[in-house]
Amino acid sequence: MSIPAVAPAPSLPRRLLRGLRLFAATALLALGGTAAAENLSTVASGSLAPLPAGADQPQLLVVDGRDVVLSAGKAWALASDGKAWQPLTLAPAGATADVRMAVNAGGQTWLLRGTADGSDRLQGVRLQGDSLALGRTLALPVALGQAQVAALGDVLYVAGTGADGSMRLYRHALAAEAGGWQAQPAWPAPGPLVALQGQKNGLYAVIGDATGDALWRWTVDQGWRQAPEPEGHILPGSLRALGQAHLLMLVRDAGATRLRTFHTITSAWATLDAPATAAAPAPLAIVARGTGLAWAGADGGVHYAEVQGGKHLLGWLDWSVIVIYLVGMIGIGVYFYLKDQTASESEFFVGGRSIPFWAAGISLYATNTSSISFIAIPAKAFETNWQYLTNNLVAVLGLMFVAVWIVPLLRRLDLMSVFSYLETRFHPAIRMLASALAIAMQVGSRLSVILFLPALAIATITGIDVVWSILIMGVFTIIYTVMGGMRAVVWTDFVQVFVKMGGAIFAIGFIVWTLGADFDGIREAAMAEHKTKLLDFSFDLTKATVWGFIFLVVFDVVLTFPKDQVLMQRTLATKSDKEAGRSIWIFAAIMIPGGFIFYSIGTALWMYYKHNPGRLDPLLPIDATFPLFIAAELPPGVTGLIIAGIFAAAMSTLSSIINSVATLLSVDFYDKLAKNPTERGSVRFAEIMTVVVGLAGMGLALVLSRYDIHSLFDVSIELAGLLGGGFAGAYTLGMFTRRANSPGVAIGIAGSIALTLLAWSFDLVHPYFYLGISILLCIVIGYLASLCFPAPARSLKGLTIYRQDAT
């Protein structure tokens, strides 16, 4: 009798994946089309003190943070209580009678002044007590009629009509010591100039027309291009920049006046609720004030409207999901603490060299995809395109070389600190110098940024102050890292990869479902705006090009992969050199699909906010776009799940950095400098340093929270290049040459750091090049300097990639 075949029971991973698919499909079916259409931002309006007597033709401006009225050669400043205008003394008297408008640039206010022939100069002005003092004058090349002035960073732009009636545009860089005014191409459209404004690396000009104004945008890459029309007439003087990517203005059509925003990334318009005072006859004067506008009415009143963002508090279900995740991470730390209470150095630093290669590979990816991947990369793709993804594609090719040649070589040496190699190959001083620079780079350029980004997300979503968010994140990470050592770090990484990738995939699916389109529709719309542009083969060194990424990967991955203790420590924790190489293959296999997921989030967000511009908060930084979407658009429970993903993205890298830096401090410094170091003392010192390093990262993150930084992704790249490239070239000199020696390497490290700082101070190239340049300089200078000293006398067996030195 034959026995019918019975299908084997699905494996646990398959059951989990099947459950996740069922959950996602059910959630999307239940939640599709639930996104609200109303604006997230509100408008607060009110009135200031009425215009002072005698201010019949007023000019409103803000000087050094105070509201000022100019009229007929007189000036007044608003009192601190906002109830009256106080007269100001002019120096010289009556000097402001010919002011046409004002703009703030370079840390001060500039007045556009002129005569009956037109505007002919800009002049700085400051408040000094109760006096309004005039300063530096910038004479225009020619007098301009209908002139408008704008600022883009510390660059002034002035536009208007020349004597022949043609439109003129001039720029002046305030920071430049020479150069003066430079003529620029004006927009190719007829009509009077209504307004001029700078925002997000672009200049915007409003051109008047009887049927409705036109908006033109200028950027370095594309020149002048017409943007979508505002559907009405923009009131002169009302155009202003708001936040990092919005324009705010008063638009009038069919007798109604609306407060409107234009998002410079999606080129989409949104309408806010304008106060009734804005619907009165045309204001006498308008000025950018706070987060909105202020205007003087014909009735003598001074009114204002300010844009306000909101906080999106988490519900009990969201907090429950987050708490379960955090408790789970602490639980893993407690488990390994109880299991290995008498941990040796090998157990605490490299997990007893018993970590499976597949777990090490997943941990490598988790560590490499921090909160920068989860928050800043979607923001970068949302703002620009996919060009930075080229780095992932090229890096995979570099990792193939690393898996075959570099990692097995170092794993055979049974290191705990990868900088021990530099001592064996060169000198103990080289090891300690390189280790110190690596510690500074990890704490300064990575730990602080990676901790700050999720804190920003939490603050955006919950309303909890960024300071408290940083403290909570840092403390939880420190606890499970100090308790469980390397084993806890690797296995929490393993869990965190699935948490954050699941949240990322769900977010993309939710956006596609909500828009009522499939991935092909989103891809086609995004490609029409070049949002998925991936490859740039130009030779412009100020841009992120293919050649730049190849240059970076050759020096950052192929030649100097061992410089990163955080990544190398996982390969050193595997059972053998073969398993160490396999962990790199796993890492490379995950990197490309993972990169596409995070860049797809940015493109999906662009499509969502292109169709729903009112759901953006103009006051939030671009880096907060994905956290805002999570908070405002996703339903309870799912929001908590993806917030847990943000936590996972940050904590996996934070714990890895903290553990690795503590390892370096213990192995490279404590064991070398202590009088009678013991194995138990080394582990105890590492535990203490885990806490100290975590607290230091928290402190630097608190400092970052006090600054308005446009893109933390770029900041992280820049700092890593300045701090991390100098010592990295030492590995290239050690593994790929047999002639390099310790004096030459020391000179190479010092010279590369000095020259890279020089390139940074003059802003010569794109920040992505700093790391590669620093490494290249270290290699070239170090090798040439080595030729001036005797060749190494010690054996190089097992220390280079060459066959004659193989073990």
Language-model features: where?
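Membrane-interface "cap" regions at the ends of multi-pass membrane proteins
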Residues: 311-374, 481-484, 503-510, 516
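Repeated scaffold domains used in trafficking and secretory/extracellular systems
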Residues: 54-60, 95-103, 142-150, 190-198, ...
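Blade-level signature of beta-propeller repeat domains, shared across WD40, Kelch, NHL, RCC1
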Residues: 274, 279-312
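Helix-loop-helix module between adjacent transmembrane segments
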Residues: 390-481, 552-560, 648-656
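Loop-to-transmembrane helix boundary motifs in multi-pass membrane proteins
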Residues: 428-432, 443-444, 666-707
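Terminal cytosolic tails of multi-pass membrane transporters
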Residues: 340, 767-807
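Transmembrane helix-loop boundary segments of multi-pass membrane transporters
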Residues: 309-318, 379-392, 451-468, 488-496, ...
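Loop-to-helix junctions at membrane interfaces in multi-pass transport proteins
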Residues: 352-355, 376-390, 423, 498-639, ...
